[in-house]
Amino acid sequence: LVGIINFGAYIPKYRLGADTIGWHSNQERSVANFDEDTVTMAVAAGYECIKGFDRGQIDGLIFASTTPPYSEKQCAAIVAEALDLNENLFTSDVTDVLKCGTTALRSAFDAISAGSCGLMLVIISDSRQGPPRSETERNSGDGAVGFLLGSHNVIAEYEGFYSVTKNLLDNWRSNGDPFVRTWEDRFAIEEGLENVLNDAISAYLLKYNMKPSDFARVA
């Protein structure tokens, strides 16, 4: 029985919203302070996640982000040291793509299922910047979430995984670009997400001998 044992989150207190001059949207967006980045937010989320647990039992930490503060330096090691975890734990960074969070979770679940790790901490943290007044700017709030994964006392069981990989030009940020760039939404949805979702869901149901009525909710 492998799954999520606990979780914790951190959302910066500052906001861009309806009262912000030049915002032009009723949507509210969380904004990291000048002294915050994805590593500091990851530390805060990780602390909330492992509060009350024996840190010495955690033997793996994966940090996932599309916006790490370093181009070449492991952020997971910084987070592990800030959380006072064991020096002999496994650490890894997963970056450069929006599915880095689910990739990190699957890697951790696979490691636990294989017996190479017992307790693993996965922290997903992001601070994506879109061009001014863009959909990306309005919809990409800053924040972090941590998951403690293991095989005992789980609150959400991991039952299976299926993925479909297709190259799609929807969101990207080239080396040195300050902002995320996007392609035509209709193309990304109609030619990309709809097809990929249908393929992935159909294959998942077939692989695990399930049907849509077996699910109360889909997110």
Regions of interest found by a model, annotated:
Residues L89-K99, T103, R133-E137, T182-I189, ...:
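Cysteine-centered functional microenvironments
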Residues I4-N6, C49, L61, V79, ...:
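Buried hydrophobic positions in well-ordered alpha/beta secondary-structure cores of metabolic enzymes
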Residues L1-T38, S134-S202, K207:
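Condensing-enzyme catalytic core mediating Claisen C-C bond formation in acyl metabolism
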